Amino acid sequence: MQSSFKTVPFTPDFYSQSSYFFRGDSCLEEFHQPVNGFHHEEAIDLSPNVTIASANLHYTTFDTVMDCGGGGGGGLRERLEGGEEECLDTGQLVYQKGTRLVGGGVGEVNSSWCDSVSAMADNSQHTDTSTDIDTDDKTQLNGGHQGMLLATNCSDQSNVKSSDQRTLRRLAQNREAARKSRLRKKAYVQQLENSRIRLAQLEEELKRARQQGSLVERGVSADHTHLAAGNGVFSFELEYTRWKEEHQRMINDLRSGVNSQLGDNDLRVLVDAVMSHYDEIFRLKGIGTKVDVFHMLSGMWKTPAERFFMWLGGFRSSELLKILGNHVDPLTDQQLIGICNLQQSSQQAEDALSQGMEALQQSLLETLSSASMGPNSSANVADYMGHMAMAMGKLGTLENFLRQADLLRQQTLQQLHRILTTRQAARAFLVIHDYISRLRALSSLWLARPRD
């Protein structure tokens, strides 16, 4: 709303204490406590109905709260610059904070300060025309300033507290992340340590196996050969145990791929891996046969139920094909013909090897029975040693029989892999593993049976 102003010429007869001063054209405001001296440039008339406008500071009185918006400030400047003389209805003193020098030094009203000062002006009305500011007015003015400072301090404290809380949360998150990182690092270091130990064990076993192989090839003394054979058997059984664990893992992956309808390309990778793993066990058996052929023939490295169905150190290929024929379907006519031919050829090869084993046993029996009962004389000693050399030569063929049997089993699996599709081959490998697992479970039940 509009307010009346009256411009009074400046005289040195009016003095007052100033609480604000300005430097140059800057809007920087500085607050200081009243001083004992009076400044000639800041002298104003504090009479209730007079407004004094000077070139440096402007003090106005209002009969009501002044509208300090952008328009009000401009109107005030125009009246002060034009020298309009208007009177106010009441004598309320207002100190204007937030003025700045514009052009010739005319101040503009700061809206936020006008609101605060207008509220204080309502509480500091005067009824007399004194040249000194009343103590109550100064107290109210200082109280208003202190209230504003207190509100500012409270706001600053709230901001600092909020910032501290965010900092604490961030520190807690950083500590948690660091803890998890330490745990991951510890697990990684432990894994590296386990891998190092495992590698050292493998290197030691490989070194021992090489030493054993060199002993066997060189034909060292009987005691050393027996020691090498014993260590070779132990190494084979250890490697076979690891092979079973790895084979179980591969079968689990293959079963998951079949159940999840994995693509043919990805499934083919798993099937080829299982086939390659079967090739590995045949290689290990070949090494074990060189070390101790009778141990491999007896199948002491297998469970009792597996030994019951064992033929020349392993399974019969023809029986395995019969099991697969009932579980791998549907098969095309060409696949059925291929499997039938494979089964017939496997059966014929098994019969031939079985007949060869029978012939070997009969030949050994005749050789050992035709020799004299003991080397009592020099002639008998020569005859005895001759027959024992013949028997040793015939036993040498036993190793060939076991190799031929393992080769038949390996070729049967490879032919089956080529006849079947990728998905059918995957199911075939699962059926073979499940069958052997049932034999092992049967052996465990048999060994755990109660004995009266």
Swiss-Prot record:
According to its UniProt entry, this protein's organism is: Arabidopsis thaliana
For the region Leucine-zipper, give the residue spans. 192-206
The segment(s) forming the DOG1 domain are 233-449
Name of the protein this chain belongs to: Transcription factor PERIANTHIA
Q: According to its UniProt entry, what is the function of this protein?
A: Transcriptional activator involved in the determination of floral organ number. Acts to determine floral organ patterning by establishing floral organ primordia in specific numbers and positions. Plays a role in regulating stem cell fate by directly controlling AG expression. Binds to the 5'-AAGAAT-3' cis-acting element found in AG promoter. Might represent a target for a post-translational modification by GRXC7/ROXY1.
Q: What happens when the gene is disrupted?
A: Mutant plants have extra floral organs. The modal numbers of organs in mutant flowers are 5 sepals, 5 petals, 5 stamens, and 2 carpels in contrast with the tetramerous pattern of the wild type.
State if Transcription is listed as a keyword. yes
Instruction: Please provide, alphabetically and separated by semicolons, the GO molecular function terms listed in this UniProt record.
Output: cis-regulatory region sequence-specific DNA binding; DNA-binding transcription factor activity; transcription cis-regulatory region binding
Might you name a Gene Ontology BP term for this protein? Answer: regulation of flower development
Write down the PANTHER family for this protein, in alphabetical order. Answer: TRANSCRIPTION FACTOR PERIANTHIA, TRANSCRIPTION FACTOR TGA9
Q: Tell me the leader sequence span.
A: none
Task: Show the GO cellular component annotation of the record.
Answer: nucleus
Tell me where in this chain the bZIP domain is found: 164-227
Q: Where is this region: Basic motif?
A: 166-186
**Family per record:** Belongs to the bZIP family.
